[in-house]
């Protein structure tokens, strides 16, 4: 194609992409079904991972739950089984009422499988993934959610904690994706969800390791998405989830300026996950919660650095992590004193 003609074609496609994006904001697309599909969630034992598991269970997905904590993972599985029992009871009642067997059969055999896995260890990921393939089947939806935070200033953070943060928050996404993507490519079907953070789009002081890991995983996700497009594997969808501070206890004590906080409070975990689920089930490539984060990211990209610093100071975002770090340090000192260290 002549380069001039191609230029106009590309220009039209870019403008059309804006039109489609605007349409998505005004009229939300119909949500796809994940009923009967194998959905694997890392970090499913608590926080957002547990809530993702419950949401996928309500949509009748077959769940595979990974967590390093066996007990909390089993607790999540118990909640999922309770949802499954309610769904099966509703199906049985509908069948008895004569609403049509064809609506019931596709949703039978709802199951949840639990695996204790440290996603920060490559071999553990690959071995557990092989067990999943043998015992459950191939994964259709992969939700990379597991995450950790050290809670130390850079010069006070032990090297092993920095490495741990990078392994769990970033490297694990490489390993889980390498484990399950090949089959998705073969059948041109699947969905990879990356739960990152707004701190993967812009940073703040005191959490260098966490920000680096989240920036890294955002880059991984974007490159993977481009690779799938280049390979014309349009049946494999990707969704990047970048929430603002979520009130899960992970960053307990983190505070912005008190006058601003009523307008930008920590997100409720339920709200965060429900918004993410809407994005996943409509194949939305990326979601920032709240939407203000889109504006913050855009302004950070165009403003001079000193202007960004001024904004951070006004919002109290420049040192928002310091109370959280102080609490972590105090808790560590208390544990050491309690254990006689």
Curated annotation (Swiss-Prot):
The active site is at 210 (proton acceptor). InterPro entries: NAD(P)-bd_dom_sf, Sc_DH/Rdtase_CS, SDR_fam. Substrate binds at residue 197. Its main location: membrane. SUPFAM superfamilies: NAD(P)-binding Rossmann-fold domains. NADP(+) binds at residues 40-64. It is an enzyme of class 1 (oxidoreductase). Keywords: Endoplasmic reticulum, Lipid metabolism, Membrane, Microsome, NADP, Oxidoreductase, Signal-anchor, Transmembrane, Transmembrane helix. This is Retinol dehydrogenase 10. The gene is RDH10.
């Amino acid at each position: 194609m002549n380069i001039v003609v191609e230029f106009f074609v590309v220009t039209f496609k870019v403008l059309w992409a804006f039109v489609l994006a605007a349409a998505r904001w005004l009229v939300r697309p119909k949500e796809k079904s994940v009923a009967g599909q194998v959905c694997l969630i890392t970090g499913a034992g608590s926080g957002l991972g547990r809530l993702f598991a419950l949401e996928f269970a309500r949509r009748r997905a077959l769940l595979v739950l990974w967590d390093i904590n066996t007990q909390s993972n089993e607790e999540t599985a118990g909640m999922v089984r309770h949802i499954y029992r309610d769904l099966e009871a509703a199906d049985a009642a509908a069948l008895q009422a004569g609403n049509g067997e064809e609506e019931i059969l596709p949703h039978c055999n709802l199951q949840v499988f639990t695996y204790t896995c440290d996603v920060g260890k490559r071999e553990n990921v690959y071995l557990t993934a092989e067990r999943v393939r043998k015992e459950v089947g191939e994964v259709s939806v992969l939700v990379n959610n597991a995450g950790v935070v050290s809670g130390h200033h850079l010069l006070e953070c032990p090297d092993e904690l920095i490495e741990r943060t990078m392994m769990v928050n970033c490297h694990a996404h490489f390993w889980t994706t390498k484990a399950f993507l090949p089959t998705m490519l073969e059948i041109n079907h699947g969905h990879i969800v990356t739960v990152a953070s707004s701190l993967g789009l812009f940073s703040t002081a005191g959490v260098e390791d966490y920000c680096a890991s989240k920036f890294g995983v955002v880059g991984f996700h974007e490159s993977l998405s481009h690779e799938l497009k280049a390979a014309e594997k349009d049946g494999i969808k990707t969704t990047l989830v970048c929430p603002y501070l979520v009130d899960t206890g992970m960053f307990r004590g983190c505070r912005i300026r008190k006058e601003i906080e009523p307008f930008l409070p920590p997100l409720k975990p339920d709200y965060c996950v429900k918004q993410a689920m809407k994005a996943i089930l409509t194949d939305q490539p990326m979601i920032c919660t709240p939407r203000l984060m889109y504006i913050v990211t855009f302004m950070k990209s165009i403003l001079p650095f000193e202007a960004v610093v001024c904004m951070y100071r006004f919002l109290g975002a420049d040192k928002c992590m310091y109370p959280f770090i102080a609490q972590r340090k105090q808790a560590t000192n208390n544990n050491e004193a309690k254990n006689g260290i």
